[in-house]
C-alpha cells in the first residue's frame, strides 16, 4: 500500500509499545493521509531514561505553503483519537523538512528511531535516497530540554 501523495510505502514493520499498547506506525500513517496540508510523515518511539514505555514522536513534512501550527496539531490529535484511540495519540507532533526514505520510497523508521534515541544510526548503505535529512532529527534526541528552554 502506498501513501497517496508521495507514493511512499505505507507499510511499516516497526512495532513498539507506546502508552501501554503495541501498534505500528503505519496505523498513524493511514490517518495522516487524510490531511491535504501534509506531504509525508514518519513516526517512531523515543524511550527516556526511567520510562516503562516509549512515547510516540510523529514527524510531519508539510506541503509548500502550509505550516504545522497548533490548529493542525489539534486536528491531527483529534483525528487519531477518533479513528484509532486516545492511546495512539503521539506525545509530540513535530515539523521536519524531509522524511528519510530508501531509493524505492520506503520510510526508514529505524534510522529516525536511532537518532532521536541518541544512538548512532545503523548502517545506511547506498539505499537511502536523502541521507542529508537525517541530521535534522538529531535535535529531537534532547526534546525535553529544548521544550523546557522554549518555555522560559
Where are the regions that the model predicts?
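Short acidic amphipathic segments
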Residues: 32-41
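Hydrophobic face of alpha-helices
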Residues: 25, 29, 73-77, 109
Amino acid at each position: 500500500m502506498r501513501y497517496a501523495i508521495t507514493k511512499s510505502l505505507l507499510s511499516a514493520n516497526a512495532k513498539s509499545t507506546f502508552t501501554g499498547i503495541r501498534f505500528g506506525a503505519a496505523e498513524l500513517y493511514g490517518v495522516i493521509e487524510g490531511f491535504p496540508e501534509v506531504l509525508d510523515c514518519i513516526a517512531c518511539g523515543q524511550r527516556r531514561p526511567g520510562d516503562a514505555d516509549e512515547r510516540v514522536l510523529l514527524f510531519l513534512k508539510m506541503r509548500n505553503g502550509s505550516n504545522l501550527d497548533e490548529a493542525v496539531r489539534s486536528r491531527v490529535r483529534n483525528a487519531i483519537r477518533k479513528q484509532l484511540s486516545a492511546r495512539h495519540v503521539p506525545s509530540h507532533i513535530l515539523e521536519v523538512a524531509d522524511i528519510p526514505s530508501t531509493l524505492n520510497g520506503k520510510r526508514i523508521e529505524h534510522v529516525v528511531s536511532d537518532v532521536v534515541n541518541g544512538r548512532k544510526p545503523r548502517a545506511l548503505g547506498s539505499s537511502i535516497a536523502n541521507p542529508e535529512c537525517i541530521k535534522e532529527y538529531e535535535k529531537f534526541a534532547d526534546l525535553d530540554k529544548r521544550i523546557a528552554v522554549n518555555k522560559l
